[in-house]
Amino acid sequence: MEGVVLLHKPKGMTSHDCVFKLRKILREKRIGHTGTLDPDVTGVLPICVGRATKIAQFLTSETKTYEGEVTLGFSTTTEDASGEVVETKYVDRVITRKEVEEALATLTGTIEQMPPMFSAVKVNGKKLYEYARAGQEVERPVRTITIHEFVLLDDREVFEGENISFRFRVTCSKGTYVRTLAVMIGEKLGFPSHMSHLVRTASGEFLLEDCISFEEIEENVQNGTVESIFISIDEALSKFPKMVVDEKQAEKIKNGMFLKNELQITAPFITVFDKNDRCLAIYEHHPKHPGMLKPMKVLVNNQELKL
């Protein structure tokens, strides 16, 4: 049993909760997720099973797309709807569509962002949320992130009321805190704000419409069709360029054999396959020997090579 499961993460569960539940359903210990989603967030959560856990790091660096909602009028401790109210300032004027779109535009491109106190970012070996729960404030590291697209989804021309909400879609780099973006939008418009809803619609090439629920996974287990829920390792890595090696080279790859970059591939990672179209390893460019590739992650062992 191996591959990537595209889970439609439900609301109210942490990513670790999802891994724990999937271990029980599949009766498989080797399971890991490819990036944390907050409990209130739903949507695409790729989970690696069996040998696929070795490729998790190559699936976490992808861009992510979210659809969410910002609410102006009050901010919270967690920057989303689950936290306690920190500041209230009713929206006492009409907000125009142009104002919102201009705010989103200023947050598009390469920007700096400070992670929220209620996050898993570590400072001095301790997670920020641990400081927050103890009532301690610490200096947080500023991150550089990339916002590829930030668009308003509401079709209204004006927004008015004591608490204004509007929907958006954002495509961003790994490590972006979308709830912090919601706070930044409010700051641009002059009001406290928080993220009131969020769903991840894409993680790299993995899309929400291709995800399955826990109920569907359990149904496949009961029906004996569990293999159908997996994306193969080969398919999950299909975005990387591919090299094919002969049988003798395949046997040496498990021991860390270097390879010549005969195809002159410039991409940072290269997948290496045997003649049977089985992915053996992921290689990268050797930093000291131009034209050579070195293994970054070997996916097979002695026993598997003999199969």
UniProtKB/Swiss-Prot annotation:
Its job: Responsible for synthesis of pseudouridine from uracil-55 in the psi GC loop of transfer RNAs.
Enzyme nomenclature, EC number: 5.4.99.25
Classification via HAMAP family: TruB_bact
Disulfide pattern: none
Catalytic activity: uridine(55) in tRNA = pseudouridine(55) in tRNA
The protein's enzyme class: isomerase
GO terms classed as biological process: mRNA pseudouridine synthesis; tRNA pseudouridine synthesis
Keyword Isomerase recorded: yes
Source taxon at top rank: Bacteria
Sequence similarity: Belongs to the pseudouridine synthase TruB family. Type 1 subfamily.
Protein name (Swiss-Prot/TrEMBL): tRNA pseudouridine synthase B
Annotated organism of origin: Bacillus anthracis
GO molecular function annotations of the record: RNA binding; tRNA pseudouridine(55) synthase activity
Annotated catalytic residues: D38 (nucleophile)
UniProt keyword terms in alphabetical order: Isomerase, tRNA processing
